[in-house]
Amino acid sequence: MASIEEIAHQIIEQQMGEISRSHTEVSQTALMDGTTQRIQLVPSESSVSVPQRIQIVTDPQTGQKIQIVTALDQSGTNKQFIFTNNDGSLPSKVILARQDSSQGKVFLTTPDAAGVNQLFFSTPDVPAQHIQILSDTQSLDQNLNKQFVELCVVCGDKASGRHYGAVTCEGCKGFFKRSIRKNLIYTCRGSKDCVINKHYRNRCQYCRLQRCISLGMKQDSVQCERKPIEVSREKSSNCAASTEKIYIRKDLRSPLAATTTFVTESKTSRTTSLLDSSMLVNIQQSGVKNESILLTPNKVEACQGDLSTLANVVTSLANLNKSKDLPQTNTEFSIIESLSNGDSSLSDLAQDDQSNSEVTRAFDTLAKALNQSENSTQGSSECVGSGSNLLPDVNVEIEGPLLNDVHIAFRLTMPSPMPEYLNVHYICESASRLLFLSMHWARSIPSFLSLGQENSISLVKACWNELFSLGLAQCCQVMNVETILAAFVNHLHNSMQHDKLSSDKVKLVMDHIFKLQEFCNSMVKRCVDGYEYAYLKAIALFSPDHPGLENVSHIEKLQEKAYMEFQDYVTKTYPEDTYRLSRLLLRLPALRLLNAAITEELFFAGLIGNVQIDSIIPYILRMETSDYNSQIIGLTA
C-alpha cells in the first residue's frame, strides 16, 4: 500500500508536467477512493507570475484528507495566496506563506494559526522545491482582503511585534516578562513536551517558558527592564515588602511538593536582607479554595484590615519617639503604661492628637493578631488580670499545676482569605501573629507573672526564638512552613548566582533553614500533641541559665515543676512509649542552635525592617489582656 510520501512524489511529478498551463485552467474530479481533486492556488499579489498549485488527496491507509502544496520560489518574501475554483465561485480559503530562515523550509499556514505543525521534505525530481503536508481538518475561512498576518512563533496567535528578540503575541510577551522578572519556576506534569498553541498555551507554563527561550526570547532583555541603571530609589525599611506579590500554585495536593523561588535586588543596612521588596515566590499550595484571587496592594489592605501588627507598632512608636526626640530605651515602658492605663502622661510625650491616635491604633491592631477560644479568653482574664499589675520580684510558691487546660489551646488564625496571588506581607503577617500568640501564651501563665516585670521581659527576650520555633512546628500545616522554607532556600540559590549574598552569609542562613526544617519535621513525625508542646514551651521559657536574670532559684523551680508535670502527662498518656519523654526533651537543645537574628531576617524584616524583635517584646508584654482579646478576628470554639 502506498505511503503518503509516495503519493506526494506522484502528485509532484504530475504538477511539474502541468506547470506550463495557464493559471486559470483547473481540472476537478470527484474526491473519492483516493482520486485527486486539483485546485489552483492563485497569488493575491501581481508580483508572483507563476501560479502555485495545491492538491487534496485521501490517504489510502487512514482515510484522512491531505493537502499537498508546492512551495514558494526562492525569493524569500512573504506572500498571501487564495484558493479559486474554475466555476467562478467566490474563494473561501486563505494560505499565508513565508520563507523560513533555515535553508530549504517554507512555512504555509492560515491567519487563524491552523497548520502550525508542519512536515517538510523535498524530492530529487523537484530540485530547489519543497512541499508541505497539512491536515485538512480545520476551517480556513478568512476575509480575502485581509493583509498578511505575522504569527507568534511560540503559540501561533497573531503577533504584535518583536518582543525580547522574537516575534510574539501580547500574551506570550507578558507571560515571558512576568516569568523572568519574578524568576518563577514552573513544573511540567507531563513529559516536558506539551503542545503549545493558541488554545493550549496556558495548560503548561513550564513548556511554554521553555518554548519561549528556545525560540529566541532573551532573558537579559527583561532583566535590563527590571533593573534600570539610572534609577536609584531608597525604600522604606518598614513594610518595604508589603506590596510585592507572592505566587502560590494551588494545583498540587501535597504541601510538601513545592517548587519555590525568591528574587531580591536591594540590601538593607544590617547585612543583606533576606526578605526585601522585590522578593517573589512561586509556591505550590494545597488545601485552599479553588478560585483565583489577585491581591493588589489595595486589595491586600482591604482584606487584611489592620493586621500589620508589628509594622504598625514599629511605625507608630518610631514616629512618636522621633517627634519628641526620646530614646526608645527610656520611653518604652512609659509609653505602654500610658496606653494601658489611660494615664495623661501620653499627652506629655506627644502633644498632638495625631501621635496619640497613631499609637492607640497601632495597639488596637495587636488584638486582631490572635486566635483564642472563648473559654481560653475567659481563663486568661481570670488568671492573668491587668498587664499593668505585674507581681513584684519575689520568690512565690505556686500552688496547683503550672499549666492547665487554658494553656494547652494554641490556635493560630491565618490572614484571610487565602488567595492564589499573595505578597510578602502575608508570610510576615503570619509570623507576626504567631509571635504575638506565643507572647500572649507566656503571659497567661500565673507563674510567669510572679517573676516580676524585668525578669519576665528578660526571659522572653532570651527565648522568644525558641518559643517561635516551637510554634512553627506546632502550626506547621496551618502556616505551610515547608513551602516557606523551600522558598527561602531557592532565594539563597538565586542570590548566590547573582552575587547578591556572600558565600559565608548563604552558608550561615542555609544551615539555619535546614536546622529549622529538620526540627519541624521531627516534631511532626513524632505526632507531638498540644499538651506536650505546652510543656516544652514552658521548659524553654523557664530556663534559668540566661544571663542577666534575677531570682534564678525561683525560675529553676518553675522549670523543674514544668518537667515533673510533663513527665506525669507523658507517662499516663503514652505508657507504652517508654522513651517518648526523653526523645522530646532531646529536641530542645536543637532550638538553642537557631540564630535569632536570622529568624528575624527571614520572617520579620520584610514587615519591620531593621527593628529588632527584642525591642518590641516589652510593648507586647505590657499590653492589657482585654487588648488581646476584645477584637479578636475569627474566634474558634
From Swiss-Prot:
DNA-binding region ranges: 149-224
Among Gene3D superfamilies, the record links this protein to: Erythroid Transcription Factor GATA-1, subunit A, Retinoid X Receptor
Q: Its GO biological process terms?
A: cell differentiation; negative regulation of DNA-templated transcription; negative regulation of transcription by RNA polymerase II; regulation of transcription by RNA polymerase II
Question: Which Pfam family, just one, is annotated for this protein?
Answer: Hormone_recep
Q: Name the CDD domains on file.
A: NR_DBD_TR2_like (cd06967), NR_LBD_TR2_like (cd06952)
Where does the record say this protein resides?
Nucleus
Q: Which parts of this protein are zinc fingers (NR C4-type)? A: 152-172, 188-207
Sorted alphabetically, the keyword list is:
Activator, DNA-binding, Metal-binding, Nucleus, Receptor, Repressor, Transcription, Transcription regulation, Zinc, Zinc-finger
Functional description taken from the UniProt entry? Orphan nuclear receptor. Binds the IR7 element in the promoter of its own gene in an autoregulatory negative feedback mechanism. Primarily repressor of a broad range of genes. Binds to hormone response elements (HREs) consisting of two 5'-AGGTCA-3' half site direct repeat consensus sequences.
Query: Which family does this protein fall into?
Result: Belongs to the nuclear hormone receptor family. NR2 subfamily.
Q: What is this protein called?
A: Nuclear receptor subfamily 2 group C member 1-B
The source organism is: Xenopus laevis (African clawed frog)
Supply the source organism's classification: Eukaryota, Metazoa, Chordata, Craniata, Vertebrata
